[in-house]
């Protein structure tokens, strides 16, 4: 485009109307996205779906057949996939709820108009800029039997002998063993999340709270002052003001934090890949990690077609759950 | 949008509270609690930073001591000079360099193209705009994992495995960036651009000369977030980079850990190579980070 041409003659060029000319400019501006999205979003999705309908095993292989929806049936009846889904649902439930409550509590504490709040905000947020790799490596060390986690637990008088990331005992077994040391649950699906898995959950909650705190803080600061003053006149202070005024106004942020949390936790991968590789006895196996091993496995263990089908099932579950969260919270707001 | 208005941090509310002593006590409790929390949030980093100076026996000894018995600065030098098979020279410096240039290239391209596409959506009328924008929002709700791993098969067929192409090309322009920039340009007054436009500047010139300089705060916020996401990216390089020579620091660290499981001090020093630069960036650009809360909030609406 010639920058110096007067607008009138430019608009009349090539026999296009002003509107057509404008539209062409628009498409040129968004062309990077159009090109990128058609290859790497739409193209990849179609390709991924096509792969999921084949019996492709080793990724580089050119030897595969079309087998329809067989992979989807195989995936749903695959024991490892079922275990990984149960694991990740525990993970999402516990991590999402605790990190949302924790982030909100932290934001409320920081929202006060007191000196030093900016410094605390900065200090709280800083650790969350570190990568999941660094966090995982650091906690891998903190969680060893002779590590600092056990050391601090010992200082406050708690049991300090646990090898956190090697313990497959389920939560319900741990509770039962408080009463009967021999307590075991034979069904793998009913044991609850393992000690190793809960250790990773705790780490994840700890590192995500500051990021989500920032979202709540931004929303809290958007609530106009007069609303609190009005509430105060009505006699609503403290907890009552929080439940009747603040929380309803934060509803969109709560939805956002829950949805972001759900999408993130259901795809959890980095921590598992670095810390446990799915062990002990598959109690930290997640769908994302399973899909990864099935895609990149050796020639005998790779099942790329099946892995693609699992990825679509996981995506469908995530979309379904986030949609339900949105609906549920919107409906509950209508009832109020 | 972008930059959250910094509220004046007025000291304690003007009104006098009759229950002054209990208020002072409340404040003391609040500050103590927050200081304690700050210590807890920082503890893992401080403990592992101190751990980098311990010997390999001391670092797994029971009971663990917070301070090293002797400050072994040579641990850092040793980690820096670590060599592994298949890589010429020092691995950590190589991985660090790869992470830096990938982060910078990703940041520059993403910021420029996000701004360009965002400008198109915010300012120019063309058929299908609403539909396309809805499509962008929909792809943001799509879990990244769906295309990530089957993408591996796709790039394998293209011969892109063990090159940087899968880490650069698909992320030239990302939905999050487009969304942020579109909302930002919509919040800018259009008059300045109209003046330039009437003066005969083309749309593109107006975008580069007028709109871009005005959007500095949004561009900086976006740039930091994109650099950080590239710097911290793990699964991408893990999938697409095979040879240790090409790895970034994140996957390099994981590779190093799998090779030298008991070399805790070197693992922790390597972690510091990754964590310290991003922490420095955070403290320098702190105010842009704090505004990212409202940016991300906006992305979710």
Placement of each model-derived feature along the sequence:
Chain B
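Short, Lys/Arg-rich, polar N-terminal cytosolic tail immediately upstream
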Residues: 1-22
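A structural signal for multi-pass alpha-helical bundles of membrane permease subunits
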Residues: 6-7, 18, 27-301
């Amino acid at each position: 485009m010639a920058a110096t041409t007067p607008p009138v003659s430019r608009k009349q060029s090539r026999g296009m109307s002003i509107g057509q000319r404008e539209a062409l400019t628009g498409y040129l501006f968004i062309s990077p996205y159009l090109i990128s999205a058609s290859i790497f979003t739409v193209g990849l999705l179609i390709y991924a779906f096509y792969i999921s309908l084949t019996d492709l095993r080793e990724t580089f292989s050119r030897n595969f057949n079309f087998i329809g929806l067989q992979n989807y049936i195989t995936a749903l009846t695959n024991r490892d996939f079922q275990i990984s889904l149960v694991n990740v649902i525990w993970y999402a439930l516990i991590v999402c709820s605790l990190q949302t409550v924790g982030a909100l509590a932290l934001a409320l504490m920081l929202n006060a108009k007191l000196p030093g709040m900016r410094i605390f905000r900065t200090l709280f947020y800083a650790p969350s800029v570190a990568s999941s790799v660094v966090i995982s490596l650091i906690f891998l060390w903190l969680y060893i039997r002779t590590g600092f986690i056990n050391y601090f637990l010992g200082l406050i008088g708690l049991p300090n002998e646990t090898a956190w990331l090697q313990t497959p005992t389920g939560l319900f077994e741990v509770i039962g063993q408080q009463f009967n040391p021999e307590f075991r649950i034979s069904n793998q699906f009913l044991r609850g999340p393992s000690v190793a898995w809960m250790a990773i959950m705790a780490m994840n909650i700890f590192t995500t709270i500051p990021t989500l705190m920032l979202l709540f803080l931004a929303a809290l600061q958007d609530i106009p002052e007069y609303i609190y003053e009005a509430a105060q006149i009505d006699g609503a202070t403290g907890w009552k003001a929080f439940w009747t005024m603040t929380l309803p106004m934060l509803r969109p942020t709560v939805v956002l934090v829950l949805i972001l949390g759900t999408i993130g936790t259901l795809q959890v991968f980095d921590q598992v890949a670095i810390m446990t590789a799915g062990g002990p006895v598959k109690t930290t196996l997640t769908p994302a990690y399973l899909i990864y091993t099935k895609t990149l496995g050796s020639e005998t263990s790779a099942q790329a077609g099946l892995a693609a089908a699992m990825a679509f099932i996981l995506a469908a579950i995530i979309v379904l759950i986030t949609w339900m969260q949105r609906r549920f919270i919107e409906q509950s707001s209508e009832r109020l | 949008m972008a930059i959250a208005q910094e509220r004046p941090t007025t000291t304690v509310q003007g009104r006098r509270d009759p229950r002054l002593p209990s208020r002072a006590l409340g404040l003391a409790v609040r500050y103590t609690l927050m200081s304690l929390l700050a210590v807890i949030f920082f503890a893992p980093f401080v403990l592992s930073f101190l751990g980098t100076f311990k010997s390999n026996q001391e670092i797994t000894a029971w009971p663990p001591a917070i301070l090293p018995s002797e400050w072994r600065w040579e641990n850092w030098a040793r980690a820096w000079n670590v060599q592994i098979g298949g890589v010429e020279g020092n691995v950590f410096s190589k991985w660090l360099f790869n992470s830096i240039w990938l982060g910078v290239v990703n940041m520059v391209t993403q910021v420029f193209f996000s701004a360009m596409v965002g400008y198109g959506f915010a300012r120019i009328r063309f058929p299908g705009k609403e539909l396309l924008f809805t499509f962008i929002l929909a792809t943001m709700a799509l879990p990244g994992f769906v295309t990530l791993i089957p993408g591996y098969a796709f790039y394998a067929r293209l011969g892109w495995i063990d090159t940087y192409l899968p880490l650069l090309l698909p992320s030239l322009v990302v939905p999050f960036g487009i969304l942020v920039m579109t909302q930002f340009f919509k919040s800018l007054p259009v008059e300045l651009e109209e003046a330039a436009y009437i003066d005969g500047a083309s749309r593109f010139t107006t975008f580069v000369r007028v709109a871009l300089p005005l959007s500095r705060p949004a561009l900086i916020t976006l740039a930091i977030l994109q650099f950080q996401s590239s710097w911290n990216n793990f699964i991408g390089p893990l999938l697409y980079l095979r040879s240790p020579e090409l790895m970034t620091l994140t996957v390099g660290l994981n590779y190093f850990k799998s090779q030298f499981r008991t070399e805790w001090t070197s693992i922790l020093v390597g972690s510091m190579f990754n964590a310290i630069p991003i922490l420095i960036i955070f403290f320098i650009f702190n105010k842009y980070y704090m505004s990212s809360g409202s940016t991300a909030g906006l992305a979710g609406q």
